[in-house]
Amino acid sequence: MEIKLFGKWDSETVTVKDPSLKSYVSVAPVLVPHTAGRNSKKSFDKSKMNIVERLANKLMANQENTGKKHETLAIVEEALTIIENRTKENPVQVLVDALENSGPREETTRISYGGIAFLQSVDVSPSRRLDTAFRNIALGASQSAHKNKKTVAQCLADEIIFASKADMQKSFAVRKKEEKERVAQSAR
């Protein structure tokens, strides 16, 4: 029997194009992406967690949604359905493309040398790239749904679709990535 995400989408055909993210993006076939924190005991175990669950966890990160995992998984499932209807592609593949396009490759860090602090450009680890991408996608969806007729699921679907196309005008996550990389480039 073939296991599909939410009983609908096959994750066997999903490919990660970015070689640095391959070992950190988990698209292992699961029926319901809910591990109940099993992968939070060790440092890099979150890379074993399914990306759909990590997205749901990031959506739960604000005050009014804390702990409402079932509601958040329903929102993510609805968003994936909307993505499938609009793009006619596997929504998990669209999510992977969005993560690749919205994770910054370099950032700045603050270095103090002789009492003078300045910014220094540094490369970003693949794990941090993914964390930043998840955070920006979730933040962009929740901000665009605030005081809007659209539901959070519709806004999340829009954000993922625009991020997968690397649309800087419409995607909050891609805009934030470009902003961080621009600041890092000026700090070289």
From Swiss-Prot:
Pfam family, any one: Ribosomal_S7
Keyword terms of this UniProt record: Ribonucleoprotein, Ribosomal protein, RNA-binding, rRNA-binding
GO biological process per UniProt: translation
Cellular component, GO annotation: small ribosomal subunit
Keyword Oxidoreductase: no
Superkingdom field: Archaea
GO molecular function: rRNA binding; structural constituent of ribosome
UniProt-listed InterPro entries: Ribosomal_uS7, Ribosomal_uS7_arc, Ribosomal_uS7_CS, Ribosomal_uS7_dom, Ribosomal_uS7_dom_sf, Ribosomal_uS7_euk/arc
Family named by the database record: Belongs to the universal ribosomal protein uS7 family.
Assembly behavior: Part of the 30S ribosomal subunit.
Function: One of the primary rRNA binding proteins, it binds directly to 16S rRNA where it nucleates assembly of the head domain of the 30S subunit. Is located at the subunit interface close to the decoding center.
Protein name, UniProt field: Small ribosomal subunit protein uS7
Provenance organism: Methanococcus maripaludis (strain C7 / ATCC BAA-1331)
